[in-house]
Amino acid sequence: MSNLLVQVSKTGPSSVLQVITKEIPKPAPNGLVIKNAYAGLNYIDTYLRTGLYTAPLPYIPGKEAAGVVAAVGDKVEADFKVGDRVVYLTPFGAYAQYTNVPTTLVSKVSEKIPLKIASAALLQGLTAYTLIEEAYPVKTGDTVVVHAAAGGVGLLLCQMLRARNVHVIATASTAAKRRIAIKNGAEIACSYEDLTKVVADYTNGKGVDAAYDSVGIDTLSSSLDALRNGGTMVSFGNASGAIDAIPLKFLSARCLKFVRPSLFGYITGHAVFEGYVSRLWKEILDNNLNIAIHHIFKLSEAKEAHDAIESRATTGKLLLLCNEDLADA
C-alpha cells in the first residue's frame, strides 16, 4: 500500500505544493501511525510554505488531523489500539494519508463527534482557549476587538467570549461576514476601516480592554488605537503581512501591552493537551460551540486549498480529505 502526501521542497507560492507517493511509514517505538481522515488547514501552513516561518526542507505540511490508529509502536505505554478514533497536533506531516506521530499530542475522539468536526475544531479551538485564558485572560464585562471574526478562530472566539459575558466588537471584510460574526456572538461588527470610530462610539472614548488580531500589519495601527490605557494587543497571525517591529514609543505613552502567543508554547505536554481537548469535546457535545466548515478539498487539491485560505474570502474552516473511506467516520 502507498501513502499519498503533499511535500514542500522549496519555499514559494502555492504551486510549490507537490503531491507525491511514498511508502506508508512504520510506527516509531513510542509512536502511532494514523490513517488520516481529514487534515486541517491553518494560516501557519502558508507562512511556512512561503518562508515567512522557517521549516526544514523538504517537509510535509500540516499541523493537525483526525483519523484512526493504523499501527502502534512496540514501546507505547499509553492506552491506544488499532482502530481508535483520534486527533493529533504535530509540527509537520498532517497533509498525508498516513502520518507517524508520538503519542504526546494525540487524543481520542468520542464516537458521537464526526472526525471532520473533530479535525475542524482541534487547533483553532485550542488556539481560541489559550488566547482568552492565557494571552489575555478575559474577565466578565470586558470589551474586546476580534479581527477577522468570520474566520475559523474568529468564529470560535466570538462564541467563547459571549459565553463568558465579554462584549465583542468584530471586524470582517464584507457585510455577509459581519452578519456571521453577529450570529456567533459579536455585539457589533464593522469593517476594518470603521473600527476606530466604532470603538470610540461604543466605549465612549475609553477604548477596549484587548484586541485579538490575526490580520497583521494592515490592522496594527487600528488595533493599538482601539485599546484603553493599559490595554493588551494579542497578535496571533499575519494574514495581511508580518509585523516586523513595534517601536516602544507606540506602547509606552498609554502603557499598552503587546503579546505574541504560540499555541505550541502553551501546550506543554499530554496532560495540558488532554485537558483542553476534553473541554473542547464537551462544549461541542453540549452544543455550546458551532464548528463551521467552509469547504472540504481532496488531498490532491492542496494548492487550491492554500489559494482559498490566502484569498481571505472564506469563513470557518478548510479541510483536506485524506482517505475517502473515512469521509463519514
UniProtKB/Swiss-Prot annotation:
GO terms for biological process: cellular detoxification. It is an enzyme of class 1 (oxidoreductase). InterPro entries: ADH-like_C (IPR013149), ADH-like_N (IPR013154), GroES-like_sf (IPR011032), NAD(P)-bd_dom_sf (IPR036291), PKS_ER (IPR020843), QOR-like (IPR047618). Keywords: Cytoplasm, NADP, Nucleus, Oxidoreductase, Phosphoprotein. GO terms for molecular function: mRNA 3'-UTR AU-rich region binding; NADPH binding; NADPH:quinone reductase activity. Its main location: cytoplasm. This is Probable quinone oxidoreductase. The lineage of its organism: Eukaryota, Fungi, Dikarya, Ascomycota, Taphrinomycotina.
